[in-house]
Amino acid sequence: MEKGLSSDLIIAFVAIVLHVVNYNVTAQFEYKTRYFTKLIGRNAIYYYAVFLIISALIRDHFINVAVLSDKDSIILFPTEIANMIGDSCFIFGILLNIWTLKALGIKGMYNGDSFGHIMDSPVTGGPYQFFSDPQYVGTTIAALGVAIRNQSIYGFLCTILVGVVFYISATFVETPHLKNIYSNRSYSKINFKNLKSLKN
């Protein structure tokens, strides 16, 4: 039980939750205030994308710290098999995320809807033929790969939390927010040729 209260695991859990809270809160804040667009201009979404990538890397760092502190705590496979399965899952997850980025573009992948970049229609091609939220599936599978490769109980616990937090976020926060955005297109879509109008 004491092992389950490891500070490394707790920090990883906090990082997982805070990353999702971070992008939900900042996206809704921008949508309601246009603060970042007023401050930075039409390229605000690209700075925001970098911000979210850094946030995700910080989360991943703390997950890796927890996993490495717990390496080989649950031996499910011989090392060679664990490496092969883990690496395969990790690569698949990363490739799925790259495929999602290709399908959505930077604006679609990183909450561009909240920044006034409204899509004409939902994306149904690419990975969306198979998953409703492929970027979350990809990240979860990549985390699973890390857990398997290191045969770490902490890794599996982090993977479960990643999946659960993504599911809760997508179902109860992001979907209602997107419905609100697209039901009010006149407000949601920004005329980037006339950003001065946002200050009125």
UniProtKB/Swiss-Prot annotation:
InterPro entries: PEMT/MFAP (IPR024960), Phopholipid_MeTrfase (IPR007318). PROSITE patterns: SAM_PEMT_PEM2. It catalyses: a 1,2-diacyl-sn-glycero-3-phospho-N-methylethanolamine + S-adenosyl-L-methionine = a 1,2-diacyl-sn-glycero-3-phospho-N,N-dimethylethanolamine + S-adenosyl-L-homocysteine + H(+); a 1,2-diacyl-sn-glycero-3-phospho-N,N-dimethylethanolamine + S-adenosyl-L-methionine = a 1,2-diacyl-sn-glycero-3-phosphocholine + S-adenosyl-L-homocysteine + H(+); a 1,2-diacyl-sn-glycero-3-phosphoethanolamine + S-adenosyl-L-methionine = a 1,2-diacyl-sn-glycero-3-phospho-N-methylethanolamine + S-adenosyl-L-homocysteine + H(+). Pathway: Phospholipid metabolism; phosphatidylcholine biosynthesis. Keywords: Endoplasmic reticulum, Lipid biosynthesis, Lipid metabolism, Membrane, Methyltransferase, Mitochondrion, Phospholipid biosynthesis, Phospholipid metabolism, S-adenosyl-L-methionine, Transferase, Transmembrane, Transmembrane helix. Gene3D superfamilies: 1.20.120.1630. It is a multi-pass membrane protein. Belongs to the class VI-like SAM-binding methyltransferase superfamily. PEMT/PEM2 methyltransferase family. This is Phosphatidylethanolamine N-methyltransferase B. The gene is pemtB.
